[in-house]
């Protein structure tokens, strides 16, 4: 077998190569001389160059979809999701700079781990082969173990890293076993080439078990119930910027890969698997919202909230129309922006190397409005968006998901979205009420007086502005989401039904 790879063959993966090259440059700079500001700036420049390349490709009028070595499919869907991953990663970089500025140990390796994980995440959304599926997933996950436990002097951070390592390794084993069962019956590792063989053997128990194991492994990565137990503990223990990365970039990559896999392999057409996804969606909505009601830790609230939000997202995927696939992308955009803003506010409030700990407890936010009114307004916007209140981006995402469920007559699922949103409104309002209460005489933890003049603060303010703008004028976002098409026969068939 003659297997050669030229530079031109890999050019469609140029954004990934830019990020990988940035990681190499960062490694060299660390070996020459440690300089936190230089390393952080280099990382941000590299991520910006990759994002700029994607924008030029998409809007330059010359973009041509490509199949790279039969392992990766670079289409509008890939580029759109890679851009979202880069935006989320840039937010994490800027938040990390201020967060670990006073960290007494080595700080520079954090950016190296982050860049490696970003490269894996970007490859994930392009994967069209079981081998690239697994390798890119592990390339994203393994650096995350280090990121979560990076501030190991805090016992919570070390615990979060070890807990995620053990449970994630278990999920990876499930994933490999599922792939092995499917390969045994289809004889192909390509999503696209195995469609006919997959449906020919779909009644085989081992094939169904293989598909189920893959879904369970992905459900773990997305922290969907009943595979959610790690989420609140890891979010609460991890450094705030790293929790932001896990909640945004890592999940964007996973949902992007999952959507491509379901459409390219045709697995979404298997009724028994749709039933499993429906059960997972309903459980996630109920478990995430009901457990969040009891929490007094803001990061744990956001952790349980994310479980419910990806339950809503599954409903759009289950609905299986051309418009509903666009609504998945819209919901991901609104969720990422809102989560960046919410976790960003927590990161700005936290300086665990000058103070006692991170600002996690709701008591730390009591009366915040009277000390930091702009930061309070920003966090309020994020809570309203997560709750799905009109004039915020979160409302648009949730409205489109409800429309997708109603259009396909999934009345029960539409009702579950409404019930879940009603429960969620309670704990989001509780966070807002606490911030406007009478402040304590001496707050335990507070944000820097000039937080808005820092890069991280400007990023959080920009996220809040986008949440409001997209809530008032969502048309550009919706149009872009519909154009982010996956190159698959099933997606083409759905587009022709419009």
UniProtKB/Swiss-Prot annotation:
EC number: 7.1.1.-
Keyword Disulfide bond appears in the UniProt entry: no
Catalytic activity: a quinone + NADH + 5 H(+)(in) = a quinol + NAD(+) + 4 H(+)(out)
Any one Gene Ontology cellular component term annotated for this protein: plasma membrane
Membrane topology: Multi-pass membrane protein
GO biological processes: ATP synthesis coupled electron transport
Main location: membrane
Membrane-spanning segments: 10-30, 44-64, 68-88, 109-129, 130-150, 164-184, 207-227, 239-259, 273-293, 301-321, 328-348, 377-397, 412-434, 458-478
Origin: domain of life: Bacteria
Entries under Pfam families matching the protein: Proton_antipo_M (PF00361)
Record's function text: NDH-1 shuttles electrons from NADH, via FMN and iron-sulfur (Fe-S) centers, to quinones in the respiratory chain. The immediate electron acceptor for the enzyme in this species is believed to be ubiquinone. Couples the redox reaction to proton translocation (for every two electrons transferred, four hydrogen ions are translocated across the cytoplasmic membrane), and thus conserves the redox energy in a proton gradient.
Family in the record: Belongs to the complex I subunit 2 family.
Protein name: NADH-quinone oxidoreductase subunit N
Lineage, top ranks: Bacteria, Pseudomonadati, Pseudomonadota, Gammaproteobacteria, Moraxellales
Gene: nuoN
